[in-house]
C-alpha cells in the first residue's frame, strides 16, 4: 500500500486536477438508488452496496447525479471478479453498522476504518487504502488553534460514529458537533457552529482545493495507522472470503493501480 509521501503526492495532484464535483455540491438530498433483493456474492449476481456519497474523490455524486469515485469503481471491479453487479444505496455514516448487521446491504464501502469496536459487530475485508493522517481545520481568520492540544475546551465537528469523532473526544474537545454527512462538517465550521473540523487528509485537501481555502486552513495533523476496509455481516464468512479473494485479484492484476491513477492521477507507488 501507499506510504505518506505517496499520499501527499496523490493529494497535491488530485487537488490540482479538479475532480468532478466540489464537496459543497453534495448534500443530504442524495436519494438512494433502487435497492436490490437479498443476495449472496457469486450466486444472485447482485452485490448490494452501501455508502455515504459526500467524500470526494472516493465516493460522491457527479453533475449528472451518478454515484462515482475511487471506491465506486473499486467495488464494481471487485463485484465483477465474483460475477455480480453492484446495486448501490446511499445512507448516513451512522447507519453503516446496522445496515450490515441487519443485512440491509451485503457490504459497505465508504472510507470506513477497521476498528476493534466495529469488529465486534461486523466483518472486514483486507485494507484497500491507508489514509496517513487526520487533519485539523479551522476558519481562516481563527488564530486560537495551532496544534492538536489546542482543541481542549473547544467545539469540534466530525461525522457521527467516525474515528474522527473519537479522536476529537480523545483530544479533549469540550463539545462534539456531530454531522450525518461529510459535507456538513465544513458547513458547520463555516457557519461558526464549531471551532474546528477533524477529518481525513484526502477530504481535507479536496475541500481546500475546491473553494474551501478561501474560508478555512489546516493547522495541524495527527498521524494515523488506520486503513479503509469493506464492511460486511459478521456471520457471512463466504462473503468475506469472496470479497477478499476478489480484492486480492484486483490489486494483483493491475486494475487497482489503474483506478488509483484515474482518481488521483498518480500510481500507487507515487510515481
Language-model segments: residues:
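Extended ligand-binding regions for polar small-molecule ligands
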Residues: 27, 72-81, 142, 155, ...
Amino acid at each position: 500500500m501507499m506510504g505518506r509521501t505517496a499520499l501527499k503526492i496523490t493529494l497535491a495532484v488530485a487537488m490540482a486536477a479538479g475532480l468532478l464535483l466540489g464537496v459543497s455540491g453534495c448534500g443530504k438530498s442524495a436519494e438512494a438508488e433502487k435497492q436490490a433483493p437479498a443476495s449472496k456474492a457469486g450466486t444472485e449476481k447482485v452485490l448490494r452496496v452501501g455508502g455515504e456519497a459526500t467524500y470526494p474523490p472516493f465516493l460522491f455524486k457527479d453533475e449528472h447525479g451518478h454515484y462515482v469515485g475511487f471506491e465506486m469503481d473499486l467495488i464494481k471491479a471487485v463485484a465483477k471478479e465474483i460475477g455480480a453487479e453492484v446495486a448501490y444505496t446511499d445512507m448516513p455514516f451512522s447507519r453503516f453498522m446496522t445496515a450490515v448487521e441487519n443485512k440491509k446491504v451485503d457490504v459497505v464501502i465508504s472510507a470506513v476504518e477497521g476498528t476493534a469496536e466495529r469488529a465486534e459487530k461486523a466483518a472486514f475485508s483486507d485494507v484497500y487504502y491507508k489514509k496517513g493522517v487526520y487533519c485539523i481545520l479551522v476558519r481562516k481568520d481563527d488564530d486560537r488553534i495551532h496544534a492538536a492540544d489546542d482543541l481542549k475546551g473547544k467545539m469540534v465537528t466530525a461525522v457521527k460514529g467516525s474515528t474522527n469523532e473519537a479522536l476529537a473526544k480523545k483530544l479533549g474537545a469540550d463539545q462534539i458537533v456531530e454531522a450525518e454527512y461529510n459535507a456538513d462538517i465544513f458547513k458547520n465550521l463555516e457557519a461558526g457552529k464549531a471551532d474546528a473540523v477533524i477529518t481525513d487528509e484526502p477530504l481535507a485537501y479536496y475541500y481546500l482545493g475546491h473553494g474551501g481555502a478561501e474560508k478555512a486552513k489546516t493547522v495541524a495533523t495527527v498521524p494515523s495507522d488506520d486503513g479503509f476496509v469493506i464492511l460486511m455481516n459478521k456471520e457471512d464468512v463466504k462473503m468475506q472470503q469472496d470479497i477478499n479473494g476478489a480484492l486480492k485479484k484486483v490489486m494483483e492484476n493491475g486494475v487497482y493501480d489503474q483506478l488509483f491513477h484515474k482518481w488521483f492521477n498518480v500510481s500507487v507507488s507515487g510515481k
